C-alpha cells in the first residue's frame, strides 16, 4: 500500500520517488482545481486491499464467477448507501468513471445518430455532453445550448432549440458553471419534446448529498455522477434514478455490464461504500457548507480587486475568472501561479476567442482547500496572493515571497501528515 505502509524504495526507486514527490506536492501546494479533492485514509486503505484481486462480472447474486459472496455484500452496501444519500430507488456503483457512467446511460437510452442537446463545452459543459472530440459528439447528432450575456443558463434558447430539433435527450449539468440549475424547468422543456432528461451532477454531488444544492433526482429520468470531486470519495462513476421502472433499470444495468465494462473494480466499489458512509455523517454537511462559503468569499474578494467573474457570483464550489482585461491568458496565469505553489487550471470562458490550450480564463474551486481546513480568512488571503501575482507577473521576487506564505499556510493545515 502506498500510504507509507510498505517501503518499496529499493525495489522500484523511480516509482517510489515519483509517488513521494507527488505526496509532497499535495501537502505543499494550494489546490484550487475544481475537480480535485483529498479523499480519506479509509478510502485509500480500502483501495489498497485484497479486493483488487477479485473478479466479479455481473451483479450481486448474479455473478459469472464463484467466490463472490463477500464482494456481493460490499457492492450491496455501496448501492444502498448511494440510494439513501441521494434519495434514489436505483443505483449502479460499477462505472469506472463519470465518463463511463455517461456512456452507459447514453447507450442505454439512445441509438447512434439520435439528437442530443447539451451545454457547450466552452460555456461550461463537459466533453461527454456533445464535444466533437468525444464519443458523444461522434456517435450522436449534437445540438448545444449555452449561457446568456449574464453567464446564466439560457433557458429560452434551450426551449427554442428543443422545439426546433426535437432531441431524444437533454443533458443537464456542467464542469464550469457557478450558478444553480433549474432542474424542474429543464425537465419541463424536455417533456415538450418527449425527450429523456439526464443530469450529470458530477461537480456538485457532494453539495447535493448535503442538501445545499438542488437534487435533480426527482426531475431527471437518470442522474450520473463521479464519486470524487465534491463528494471526496475514490475516482469512479455512479448512476442513479428514481420513479423509473424495472425496464429502465434493467437497460441501465445491461448497458454498464456487459455493454460498456467487464469486471467491476471491487476495491473501488468498497471505497465508494466508505465514502458514501462518510457523506451521510453530519460533519460532511458542515464541510459542504464551508465549501460554498469559501467560494463566495473568494468571488467577493476578486470582484473587489477589479477582476471579472463570469455571472458575477457563485452558488457552488467553483467560479470562472475572465482575464481578458488583465492582458494575461489562462495558460500563462496557470504557469505563473504554479511557481508560487498555487494550482489552478486554465479554462475557456463563454465566447472565448482563444483556443482551449490557451484560454482567456481560469477556473477556481474550493473543495480541496476546504477539506484541509481553510476557512474564510485563509481563502481571502489566497485571493489576495493570486491577484498580487497576476497584477505583477514579471515580479519574480513577489512570487517567491508569496510562495513562502503558501508553504507556511500549508504547513499549518496539513492534508494527511
From Swiss-Prot:
Pathway: One-carbon metabolism; tetrahydrofolate interconversion; Amino-acid biosynthesis; glycine biosynthesis; glycine from L-serine: step 1/1. GO terms for biological process: glycine biosynthetic process from serine; tetrahydrofolate interconversion. GO terms for molecular function: glycine hydroxymethyltransferase activity; pyridoxal phosphate binding. Pfam families: SHMT. It is found in: Cytoplasm. Its EC number is 2.1.2.1. One of its GO terms (cellular component) is cytosol. PROSITE patterns: SHMT (PS00096). The record marks 228 as: Plays an important role in substrate specificity. It comes from the Bacteria. The modification N6-(pyridoxal phosphate)lysine is found at residue 229. SUPFAM superfamilies: PLP-dependent transferases. Keywords: Amino-acid biosynthesis, Cytoplasm, One-carbon metabolism, Pyridoxal phosphate, Transferase. CDD domains: SHMT (cd00378). Its cofactor is pyridoxal 5'-phosphate. (6S)-5,6,7,8-tetrahydrofolate binds at residues 121, 125-127, 355-357. Its main location: cytoplasm. It catalyses: (6R)-5,10-methylene-5,6,7,8-tetrahydrofolate + glycine + H2O = (6S)-5,6,7,8-tetrahydrofolate + L-serine. Belongs to the SHMT family. Homodimer. Catalyzes the reversible interconversion of serine and glycine with tetrahydrofolate (THF) serving as the one-carbon carrier. This reaction serves as the major source of one-carbon groups required for the biosynthesis of purines, thymidylate, methionine, and other important biomolecules. Also exhibits THF-independent aldolase activity toward beta-hydroxyamino acids, producing glycine and aldehydes, via a retro-aldol mechanism. HAMAP family: SHMT. This is Serine hydroxymethyltransferase. It comes from Buchnera aphidicola subsp. Acyrthosiphon pisum (strain APS).
